[in-house]
Amino acid sequence: MKNYTPKEIVEELDKYIVGQKEAKKSVAVALRNRYRRNLLSDDFKEEVTPKNIIMVGPTGVGKTEIARRIAKLVEAPFVKVEATKFTEVGYVGRDVDSMVRDLVEAAVRMVKEEKLKKVTEKAKKIAEDRLIDYIVGKRKKQAKNPFEMLFNYPAAEKSEETEEESMQYKREEIRQKLRNGELDNYVVEIEVTDTSTPMMEMYTNLGSEEMNINLQDIFADILPKKKKIKKVPVYEAKRILESEEAQNLIDMDEVIEEAIKRAENDGIIFIDEIDKIASSGYTAGPDVSREGVQRDILPIIEGCTVMTKYGPVKTDHILFIAAGAFNIAKVSDLIPELQGRFPVRVSLKPLTKEDFIRILKEPKNALTKQYQELLRTEGIEVKYTDEAIEAIAEVAYLINQQSEDIGARRLHTVMEKLFEELSFNAPDLKGQQIVITEEYVKEQLKDSLNKYEVNKYIL
């Protein structure tokens, strides 16, 4: 896990997310506390638990993006789950333990990628030698004639040495051509491990959901690895062999051990739509999708051990960030025990027209920049006037006010409509510079605006 100060975390988040300072500060402090915990003695380390966060705010204001960006920033295992997907134990659907299993899978992928990067160069060299063997063909050493050995014929030895030198020269020649890309389209026959393994579905005590169990894993020590012959171009063979050799160079036991450790200490689980499992009214009978799910989530957030296919995983120090709009239910509608597990409560503000202008201008991945880059691939330079950006922001804000408020996601709809005609005709406009003006925005978006203007008068 990377070490950032709270200010540095907020500065990094500012590059992608506009406003919401309070939420950014809360997650920054939560992450810094993890770093501080790692510096404590073992006795204290076990006592300090993460201060879980609950974010309250309308859709499209940056709740999910904040959680996703911090996980990427500190390189922590991260998983986003929808609270509405879970059902109480005993009912058809996903059980809550699956969020921890998903987190461990994410951690295994992360650690594996890191290990693979470290062995890339070594794997390339081994793969190159294998590929040369397939192209040139391995020279089988002939056993010496007993009479040659007895009488030590120099001519036979000399002939063998000459052949060896010739083969070595040929291999180096092929190696150079490979590196220059001269043989890329040459088709070669290679032998690779068959990765298509039989699968079976079964119920396990890991949860009520169906799990795919890989038979190859179960019988790994009994069944030999299956090989198959493939005919592929050299450039493709190079990629396949490099991947196979890299896999052979990493120790999966080490990967799993490190992944479980990271998931337990650095893992972040983002539970979205938590307001949808809050009981907001009078209900009769068993409330399958609400209170039961809350009670099932409770022990995981509180700290328990979950069985995964990689081994037991403790959830005591996983950081949980929950989010919801809470426009119908309130945070107080969650069961009291669950409320108590989220000591930090943050409110995110609805976006204003000024926020929309900043969203279009400031972030590194702003939509305006994305469309510029997309059309640059067609040889078109796109520029925006300040008035045009203000007009786009105004349209998005107006539509949000008059219909469903979906926050910054409204900008995707507006921008797609704005660039629809231009994107369609882009191949015919190669080499041109297009300036998006206020008039152009109003012309392209007039249908959308007229529709919402008319809706005001429909009962």
From Swiss-Prot:
Which CDD domains does the protein's record reference? RecA-like_HslU
Biological process terms from the Gene Ontology for this record are:
protein unfolding; proteolysis involved in protein catabolic process
What are the binding positions for ATP in this chain?
18, 60-65, 272, 337, 409
Write down a Pfam family by its short name: AAA
On the tree of life, the source organism's domain of life is: Bacteria
InterPro entries reported for this sequence: AAA+_ATPase, ATP-dep_Clp_protease_ClpX, ATPase_AAA_core, Clp_ATPase_C, HslU, P-loop_NTPase
State a GO cellular component annotated for this protein: HslUV protease complex
| Xref: SUPFAM superfamilies | P-loop containing nucleoside triphosphate hydrolases (SSF52540)
Q: What are the entry keywords?
A: ATP-binding, Chaperone, Cytoplasm, Nucleotide-binding, Stress response
Q: Where is this protein localized, as stated in its record?
A: Cytoplasm
Give the signal sequence positions. Answer: none
Name a GO molecular-function annotation: ATP binding
Q: Which family does it belong to?
A: Belongs to the ClpX chaperone family. HslU subfamily.
Q: What does this protein do?
A: ATPase subunit of a proteasome-like degradation complex; this subunit has chaperone activity. The binding of ATP and its subsequent hydrolysis by HslU are essential for unfolding of protein substrates subsequently hydrolyzed by HslV. HslU recognizes the N-terminal part of its protein substrates and unfolds these before they are guided to HslV for hydrolysis.
Q: How does it assemble?
A: A double ring-shaped homohexamer of HslV is capped on each side by a ring-shaped HslU homohexamer. The assembly of the HslU/HslV complex is dependent on binding of ATP.
Q: What is this protein called?
A: ATP-dependent protease ATPase subunit HslU
Species of origin: Thermoanaerobacter sp. (strain X514)
